[in-house]
């Protein structure tokens, strides 16, 4: 059997390659950069351990735990501390704990009494027609009011998509929220009844899903996959075209001319949308144009990782982190209390904070110099967390096109990729522009793509 070509060496492509190899399907993985792993980057500097990209994996699917087990990493996996369940939202420039129970909700200063009273009307608001596509902002204002948009949804959207609720499609970006209204006619009733159904089926919600990393950070996962697949990986290979002729596929690289005639039984494209749009695809002498995918917008983000002496931070840092609503007029999108999540992230007597800046809220900030960006983040931290003194550790990383935006109308892009899979034999798509933007989503996407490829090859999974 001819191997499968996998284009893209992020976590999706790596997962797909590993799962296919487990099924006895040989693969060749092509990655344009000189390393695999994409945005997952962990840096060890002395006793500081910094994550430039994601900080945690949310274990929303058993497939994620299966991958960890199959790689033999269970002994190195560490779950977040109990206090990480606590989250803060900034209001009036101060972090306020997000309520975790009905009583806390009634007492919280995060929302006004008027907003709380408005919430009581939510079960009586009619559901929108199923064929209607609505922005997240419109959906939230209609069902629970403007204040919840400003002080709950807006900051969480910044934390997940670095995007704008006014642009995001509730159906595409938050399908579970959309499904609650469509199935139960109410978000509140849906949460109650949905929780009962999950308990009965043994399922877990994203809110209650455990969060984990590894003793040496998330790049542990990448290193393990890279080691298992090292004979299959070709880094520094930018694929500029793929061709199917007489049922077999060939790939064309801008640099590698060693094996131009190597044939594959299928191709998995695990690339960001802007790279897919540039790819030249030919199927049995027919040009397949992917340029429409260039219209998918990506949010630019810079991550800023700072260490401070514990005595120089007044806040207890007893939680996952703090998110900054846009109405608060701060520079940064939010801050993760990295050293509170997992042990071994900072030296004794010091703390590590990871902040994010830019997004569609302020894309111009990502163009500033590292020193300028650090200064803006530190300015925010002095206000929000009462940080004093100067940082003992400082790192900045830029992602000009970090996160795809599942905006209103995004369904046409997903349908386009699905249609090509169905109509072009041996061509497959996976990754964050198709199956969700979280790290867990990307792992599941790679696993499921491997399953589709195996089914296409008539291999039992």
Model-predicted segments: where are they?
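N-terminal Rossmann-like FAD-binding beta1-loop-alpha1 element of flavoenzymes
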Residues: 2-29, 454
């Amino acid at each position: 059997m001819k191997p499968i070509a996998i284009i893209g060496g992020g976590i999706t492509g790596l997962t797909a390659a590993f799962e296919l190899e487990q099924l006895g399907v040989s693969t060749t993985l092509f990655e344009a950069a000189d390393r695999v792993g994409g945005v997952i980057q962990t840096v060890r500097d002395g006793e500081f351990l910094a994550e430039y990209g994601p900080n945690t994996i949310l274990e929303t699917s058993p497939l994620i735990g299966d991958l960890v087990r199959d790689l033999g990493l269970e002994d190195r996996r560490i779950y977040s501390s109990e206090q990480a369940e606590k989250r803060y939202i900034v209001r009036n420039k101060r972090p306020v704990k997000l309520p975790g129970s009905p009583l806390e909700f009634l007492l919280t200063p995060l929302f006004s009494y008027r907003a709380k009273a408005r919430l009581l009307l939510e079960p009586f608001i009619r559901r929108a027609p199923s064929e209607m596509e609505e922005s997240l902002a419109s959906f939230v204002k209609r069902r629970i009011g403007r204040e919840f948009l400003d002080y709950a949804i807006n900051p969480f959207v910044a934390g997940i998509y670095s995007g704008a609720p006014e642009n995001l499609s509730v159906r595409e970006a938050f399908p579970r929220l959309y499904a609650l209204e469509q199935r139960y006619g109410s978000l509140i009733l849906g949460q109650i009844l949905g929780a009962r159904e999950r308990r009965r089926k043994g399922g877990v919600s994203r809110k209650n899903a455990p969060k984990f990393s590894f003793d040496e950070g998330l790049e542990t996962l990448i290193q393990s996959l890279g080691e298992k697949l090292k004979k299959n990986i070709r880094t520094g290979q930018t694929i500029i075209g793929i061709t199917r002729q007489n049922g077999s596929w060939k790939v064309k690289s801008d640099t590698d001319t060693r094996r131009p005639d190597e044939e594959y039984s299928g191709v998995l494209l695990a690339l960001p949308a802007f790279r897919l749009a540039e790819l030249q695809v030919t199927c049995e002498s027919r040009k397949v144009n992917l340029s429409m995918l260039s219209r998918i917008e990506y949010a630019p983000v810079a991550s800023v990782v700072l260490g401070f002496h514990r005595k120089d931070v007044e806040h207890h840092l007893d939680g996952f982190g703090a998110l900054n609503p846009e109405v608060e007029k701060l520079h940064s999108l939010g801050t993760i209390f990295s050293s509170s999540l997992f042990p071994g992230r900072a030296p004794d007597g010091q703390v590590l904070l990871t902040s994010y800046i830019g997004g569609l809220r302020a894309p111009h900030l990502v163009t500033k110099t590292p020193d300028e960006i650090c200064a803006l983040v530190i300015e925010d931290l002095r206000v929000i967390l009462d940080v004093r003194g100067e940082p003992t550790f400082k790192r900045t990383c830029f992602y000009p096109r970090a996160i795809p935006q599942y905006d209103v109308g995004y369904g046409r892009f997903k349908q386009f990729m699905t249609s090509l899979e169905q109509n072009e034999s041996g061509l497959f798509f996976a990754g964050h522009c198709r199956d969700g933007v979280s790290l867990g989503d990307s792992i599941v996407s790679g696993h499921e793509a491997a399953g589709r490829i195996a089914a296409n090859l008539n291999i039992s999974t």
